Amino acid sequence: MARLADYFIVVGYDHEKTGSEGFGKIIQRFPMTDWSDTPFPQGIELFCQPGGWQLSRERKQPTFFIVVLTDIDSDRHYCACLTFYEAEINLQGTKREHSETEEEDSGLIQPAQVFAPKSLVLVSRLDYPEIFRACLGLIYTVYIDSLNVSLENLVSNLVTCIVPCAGGSQKLFSLGAGDRQLIQTPLHDSLPVTGTSVALLFQQLGIQNVLSLFCAVLTENKVLFHSSSFQRLGDACRALEALIYPLKYSYPYIPILPAQLLEVLSSPTPFIIGVHSVFCSEIHDLLDVIIADLDGGTIKIPECIHLSPIPEPLLHQTQAALSLVLHPDLEVADNAFAPLRTPVPHIKLLDKEVRAVFLRLFAQIFQGYRSCLQLIRIHAEPIIHFHKAAFLGQRGLIENDFLTKVLSGMSFAGFVSERGPPYRPCDLFDELVSFEVERIKDDDQNDTHKILKHIRELAEQLFKNENPNPHMAFQKVPKPTEGSHLRVHILPFSKMNDLKVQELIQEGLNKNQNSILSPRAEKKCVVPAGSPVVSIVDKASSVFNSARRLEVVRNCIMYIFENKTLETEKTLPAALRALKGKAARQCLTEELALHVQQNRSMLNHQQFDYIVRMMNCALQDCSGSEEYTIASQLLPLATAFCRKLSAAVSQFAYTCVQDHGVWANQQFWETTFYNDVQNQVRSLYLTTKNGNQGASEPKENGVDSGNPERTVMDLAAEQLRLWPTLSKETQQELIQSEESTVFSQAIHFANLMVYLLVPLDTSKNKLLRTSATGDWESGSNSIVTNSIAGSVAESYDTESGFEDSENDIANSVVRFITRFIDKVCTESGVTQDHIKSLHCMIPGIVAMHIETLEAVHRESRRLPPIKKPKIMRPALLPGEEFVCEALRVLLDPDGREEATGGMLGGPHILPAEGALFLTTYRIIFKGTPHDALVGEQTVIRSVPIASITREKKINVQNQLHQNMQEGLQIRSATFQLIKVAFDEEVSAEMVDLFKKQLMKFRYPLSIFSAFAFAAGQTAPPIILPKQKEKNTSFRTISKTIVKGAKRAGKMTIGRQYAAKKKTGTILEERGSRSGGNEDDDISVSDDNELPSGTLKPSEKSTMEQLVERACFRDYQRLALGTISNSSTRFKSEHFRVTALNRMHSLCRSYPGLLVVPQSVQDSSLQKVARCYRHNRLPVVSWKNAKTNAVLLRGGGFHGKTVVGLFKSQNTHTAAPASSLESSSSIEQEKYLQALLNAISVHYKMNGNSTLTVRPTLALSPGSDRKSSRMSSVVKHVVPSHVDGSLSHSFARGGVWASLRSSNRLITTQTPLIDVGARLVGKDLQTTYTDHSALQSQLLKRQAALYIFGEKSQLRGFKFDFALNCEFVPVEFGDIRQVKTSFKKLMRACVPSSNPTDSESTFLKAMGESEWFLQIHRIIQLSVIISELMESGSSVMICLEDGWDITTQVVSLVQILGDPFYRTLEGFRMLIEKEWLSFGHKFSQRSNLSPSSQGTGFVPIFLQFLDCVHQIHNQYPTEFEFNRYYLKFLAYHHVSNRFKTFLLDSDYERLEHGTLFEDKGDKHSRRGICIWEYIERIHKKKTVFFNYLFAPTELEALKPSANISTLRKWEYYMEETLASGPSYDWIITPSRFNASDETDSGEEAQQQGKRKIVWPCYDDVQKVQPDAITHLMNEIERLEIKLNQTSERWQLLWERAKVKLKENAKKENNNPASLVSANLQSYQKRSMVHLPDSGLGDEQNLNASPSNGVDRRTATLYNHFTSKNEENRSYEGILYKRGALLKGWKPRWFVLDITKHQLRYYDSGEDTSCKGYIDLADVETVVPAAPTIGAPKHANEKAFFDVKTSKRVYNFCAQDAQSAQLWMDKIQNCISDA
């Protein structure tokens, strides 16, 4: 029984306090003194008016709401507030006097103008909101209606009323005002009472929002409601708290927060709070609070909060069930015949149905929770711990964030303490979680009707709990007269007589004491255990065969104990792999425990090693997130198994299993301790019952009394039931017995912890240990790594900065154990005396154990070493040498799964045992797989030293010994990863020496120290200048170029030039690029004389060598001018080759010979160069052979010269030339004008003018130009644009941002200045379907020259309209972006470890790298520039410094537009010209020099090769080289095997003497050139040749740049573990290698022709070559067998092609032939995808790799010839009128512009041509009129005639549009001829 009301309070407006805000004060309170058991709530006046005490000018309705207050003991107090407004006349004294005077004068009483609030407050510990509303309403009614009832009686009756708490009883009572009220108590006080609040909350916010709030509360987030109704706030908070039942909210719960306490919202603790909507402006700044708007029906979740959702499938099931309950009409909404009426449940029942859904949810979440309760003590109070890790593990939700947070919260801790005891009152949830969970699961899997039925059953019980008596007694409560609050004259609420009320209260209390009712006895019972914990996800779909794996583990253990070493070695790898599964680990512990019970724990050395390895393997997966079951089961086994080291010394297994983080995890020790204590308590009470009561009371105890199957919870329930009946002495004995049990167990665990934490050797070196990642002593889950002896000293104590010693280790272990003892003993109720005695005991235990271990360690070192595999030395390249001693290592698996078997199947090649070798060129691992089944194979993984991008020290889980060891992880730019763990015999000094040597060869002091200059050479080393030896950076200033070159002994430059004094201007190349890398700037100054225009005799030798360079040979091929003085130049030449830069005085990063306009003098080039970064002025690089458009490249503009560029139309009125800047700007203008003059000649010859619109570009101006061509009005040439949001892209915003990626550039024919629009990266989803939408963004004319420059530099440029030149602003990605993208690409393709997140897939990682996005932009820009040049416009590219993106784009444009560059010779010339001569910074970008050591690898050249690979994929017949050639270049441009890519420019190569070579003197040559190497290979083998090569003379290639068409380059992924990378091989195999191959060949013949091919191990294209390569190899083999001279493969290939043509001609003579005899056309149409050729290993090259088609494809070639007969430019159906019978028949017509024919066939599938019209004979193509017999329904305009010299052909198309198209096509074909 309890008081209905603890306090009644009257609170009114405080007139005494002044200020802007009003205040309230307590006018009266009853009782006047505090109850002893219930203190008076402080600050009640704040909560009466949560919005503040404010006066009102209106008469307001009385309001009612309930405020919930929580006291210091966490008890709730419900404050019901009824507020009404009183007329307030006496505001100020003067006003009152004035009003009284007026009343006397007028004789009238004036109505009040101001009203003050007054609150009647009822404070109670009971939650009866409707009773409170009725009681306060009754008091207000008595006051407002002036009833003849004493308020004093009402209040005293209210305060003294006694009501039952729970149990479902009813009580009638009256306050004495004619009222009759009924209190209905709920059946269970543990079940929340909600009324209709839950249903109301779902109506206000909806299902999804309420579920979000539900998750937020359970995961301890802050939730804030706001509404304009205080009652709604209270209901919402009540509903949300009720939804989390059976949990109880244990954080601040304030349904209505007063305005004065809003700062509470900034508290760091979670809360549920409600505030009035008037405070919205003050709550929106809260960053970590989830705000729910009850009136608007929305919730706002801040970005910083990640809400953990309910785990699936529970979330889906809950949403479906809520939808069933709240929206029952959904089921019949689609019915054709809707039911007459759908029964709508009452809102009170609906409320309970919604709660039933959440009850079902919690029953499923907490299913089996009682099986994870750990009972530590029973008496005097039960102490229960929850095994959270076991629960999560068994439920399969270890990684689930939601449940982890729920179980870690305070609410769940209260749930365990309240519901953990096995003997207590039970409620609805206990029954549900124990018996109904399986039914819930079945219902969810079957149909909705069963779900709804169960929900309604639960709802009925919840409803019955709130309304236990269906027949309610009659209630009567007087209510105020309607509108009574609007009365004009109302007397104020009268003040009650305090003494009278107090007397009446005392009288009532006396009566209650006389008739006191006994409290309701709680009915306790044994809590049912319920169903066990099961996984929340059905695991029926598991692919693993657990039974077979368990059998493997059992057999292996059996072989170990039976000492069958051979069988053990065979099964051990499989058993270790099986131990990855939990069931196998459980099996291991059970089997080992059986052998311990059989006293077979003493093992020999071999058995001991096997058992320890299996233990370590089982332990390595027991991380902090698991349930620790395996580790706890292995704990006693590790202290049982041992081996004898000597007569008196034994070594236990625990000394060898210390390398696991689980032992350093305090949570593990606590959980294991509590589990063992629980078992000991169970044994204690089982023993007590069997011993004491078994004989005397056998019948009373029954069958279960001595049943060993009884759980500890069963025993505890019985003990708790009997506890009140026991005597004090017996109770005290039980308490002491339990404490002794806990104390003895604490001593036992202290010993166990000493065993596992004290290392075998405290003086062990630190090689295999690293510092802890966290505070070890805090019990974190950081992995503690140590040596095989188990030293964890560094991790134990992070406080001391001194070196670890034995004493430090002992102290650290003591501190760790002491903290553990303190925690578990305090929680277990152990007395302080026992805890102190344990503290004294621990140091002694540690000291004794350390002393014991000294002998063990001493004896263990005398054991003979384990026999290890023999180290196999790898084959080396010519000139390659070993640098240091090989390190024995274990090659550990990385994140790639291919070689590890597992889910992908295949052999377990990794891990492999072997050695790591360091040579002058590579790091090589060579070894054998540890798995005995593939142990005969050889594993090789190698990395060129120069390509290493990162090496770091790591801790590796040794897969052989299952312990942590130090390792090394080496990542390479060749997409390789070497991850090794060092063997025990490898000392720290050996590792340090290895790393020092590695860094020495990674960054050699000089390029002549690189492997490229040492490979197989016997010439003496060249002595470089001293300054070169001191400064490894090549950014030095050479006094004269000649000195460096002469010292290198490579070339002779004119002596006059060397000896001449400096007379020229000193030019400085100062890189001032904005936003670029400082590392990209070159700060070298030119101190050399500027040579004159005529060549001196002494420089002829230099010129002779320069003209042999690739640049000049390409200039000659393109007819770009000659090197001659002005008197001998041809006037027809518009460009010339200047030798001004032959000594690199003009620009150090440019080649010696440059192509410039004919009219520009050499003297002006110096000034022009100043306007560009690093003096890289624009020069001609290539000319389109068809349109004569030229491609120019240069560096970006200097910002200071941009301002003065083309300021006005009149260039002669520029600033005077006295200033260096102004003169440079003038020369720049002149240079550009000269370029335009030279370009315009060809541009006009192509039929272009400044105002014409190219039809091929499909440009149609949006509006007519208002100014003429010669207009003097200055116009912006940069068109309007839409800014893109992509940062750091090649083209963001500017003119680019208006266009999105179209389907294919070839077909769209988009206008010319949509360039950068296609480069917008993140808008690829948008595709314009109408060209008019694009043209509104484009220029209205085509210019002769387009200058592509940086947007930042070109902003504000203004040009004369007549210049016929336009700027195109481009934004490009900086170097930092490319680096980042490459790193992400490397991590995606070559991950270092398996991803922990299941969502981290390979494709997702590739997408996040944005590598394809960058490739897309480069190709797209190149395609558009190529289109511009095809249309006759020239292009100048001046981006960044001119050596990165510029080089990529310029090279790709030439590949697209010139077939020559798609040959082997042409591609070589392109690389030499654009990349080497024009100064791409290979040394810096590839991180090859010491100066670039900190800059990182930037894959500019690799991106270019990837772009070429993408084009090669789309046009496989257009390239002479195959994709293997590209991979070969990609590998060796960073390998340092060849000298080609070593330096940054021709200037540096000249300075180092490597630019020119004396071909006559072979001994003086240094280093190998990659091009010569490739040429020699190509003469002998077809490894670089593309069998599909069939070039055409059509227009430029137009590849699609859409990301969807780009393909992953296999270079990033492929691996050949049998031989290492297939790019390092030698041309001539040695005799030894040849004999090896012969032996292996004979062996293969004996075994048969079948061979297993493993993609990650074998070179598939070598062991399984295509048909053509196979046939060529066979021919070569037969020639050798017949002792014939081998024929060159090129001749053989040509003969084969001729034979194919002859066969095709014969087949063509047969009219019934169904197959077209044309190989090339077949290749073009089908785009056959052929695999690349691979290369052999370093031992042999006879088995040439594949190049083209496989065997199935090769059989098709006999049907095709290479005749070009099937070129189809346009095709379709036309009706043709017969010549003889004049009949109209449909025919399939093909227009062939190559053969100049119009052929026709019977149908589109027909391959036999029925006839053709020679277009050379066509005279006219004209529209025609319909004739007799024409096809029906034909359009009159669909007819046209083709008149030839022989006859007139009549045609009819399908419609007028098609007819016009055919006429245009034929007309264009005729005009082009």
Curated annotation (Swiss-Prot):
Its main location: cytoplasm. The keyword Amino-acid biosynthesis does not apply. GO terms for molecular function: guanyl-nucleotide exchange factor activity. It is found in: Cytoplasm; Membrane. Residues 325-426 form the dDENN domain. Residues 1767-1871 form the PH domain. Keywords: Autophagy, Cytoplasm, Guanine-nucleotide releasing factor, Membrane. Belongs to the protein-tyrosine phosphatase family. Non-receptor class myotubularin subfamily. This is Myotubularin-related protein 13. It comes from Xenopus laevis.
